[in-house]
Structures are given as C-alpha cells and as structure tokens.
Amino acid sequence: MSNTSPSPAPSPSSAPASSLYIYAITGSDHPLRLDGLRAVGGVSGALRAVTGGPLACVVSPAPPELRPKRRDLAAHQEVQERLMADGAVLPMRFGMLAPDDTAVVAALDGKRAEYVHRLGELHATAEFNLKAARSQDDLLREVLTESDDARRLNERTRDGGGTYADRVALGELVARQLDVRRGRLADQVVGRLSEMARGKVVASPAGEDFLNASFLVERGRAEEFSRAARQLAQGYGAGYEFRLRGPLPPYSFVA
C-alpha cells in the first residue's frame, strides 16, 4: 500500500474472493461519510473503514474481475471527492488491493508516522493539474525565424537539396531548439503559478504539450488559483492551449 502516486490503470486481473479494494487513507477521526457511494465493481453500501490507531483505510470487497471500466474509475473518484470534502485524504491509485483487514492494519502500522505527517501537510488542500500545449508548427516557424543556423540548413535542404549530413544536422538542431523553447515556456508558467501554491510536481509532458504540472493549493485559495491560471492562459493568446483540472484529490503529493 505504499505506492500511492498516480499511475496507469492496471491490466484486468482476477482478485481472490477475500481481497479488499483500497480507496484512501484518512485519519480515524474523519467523518467517513460513505453512505450512498457505489463501490468499484458496482456494489452499493459495500464501503467501510478499517482502522489502525490514528488512521483509517477505506475499503470494499474487491470485484472478481478488476478492470478499468469507466463506471469503476468514476466510482473510485467519487469516493475520493466525498472524503476530500470532509478532511485530509491520502488517495490511492486505481486498482490497489490488499489480502484482508489484517494486511491493511499492518500496512497502516508500518508507516503510521509517515501517513499521519502527510495527512497533516495535506490538510485543507487540493490538487490542480495544468497541461499546456503550443502548436508545433508555430514553434517550428519561430525556430526558423530566430535561428540563423536552422534557417540556413532549411534553405540548403529545401526541395531535396543538401546532403544527408545537412538533413541530420537540421533535424537535430530543430529538436534541440524545440526542447529549449518548450522548457522555457514550462518554467515561465510554473514560476508564475508556484507563488500561489504550497507545492508543485512537474511531470514529463506528452505529445505537443510543453507542460504537465500539478500544484498543491490551499482550498481557501482554490478560486483565486483557478482565476490566475485562466488569466495566465489568456495572456499567451492564440496558438496555445491550456487545460486546467481541479480541485482534485492530491494524488501527486501523497508519496
């Protein structure tokens, strides 16, 4: 149960009949309003808490076939959001299992101090995830406009001209320049928003994204942070795409 950071959903698997599906760790004094929530696997009223000293772990019977179906992903997330509304929570990634109550209590006891400390740090906070992209065509035009070497090599290799070495050199130069520009953009955005966050985690972006960053924000500043992110996005104008999600359970700040 120690691996609590977000990760891709697991492949379909069969769980032993007595296995438990794990949702989150909270303090044992958390209200734990679980009534009406649907468990992963579609069972209503199956959620409960296993307590160990100052900690509690929200569980339900594991479904026989654990698959990342949309309804189960939604059920997992709904539990996190209900818990987060009432207090600090350490959300588990989708698909985490434990053999039985005894194993859960042992896991809670084994990292009791760490979990209690982390719950204190995450009290009254939420995660915001921001992804941002810029059109690669725009970036390429910028490289060719601002880099004499890139422009010269591009002209030399246009219409099939130049040597193989010229084409390789152009490709390598453009790739480096794109990385530099994307990194610079990411640093600018993170620098602007970090002032309003208690913490940040920057992950590797995918595709044309130049940014994939998560910010830990005090819940009292959630609207302020959202507004600042929207204003920042508007300032970059056309050619940029910003995608903000939140408030979310603080998956990125558990480990």
Region roles according to the model:
Residues 1-255:
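An interfacial alpha-helical scaffold signature
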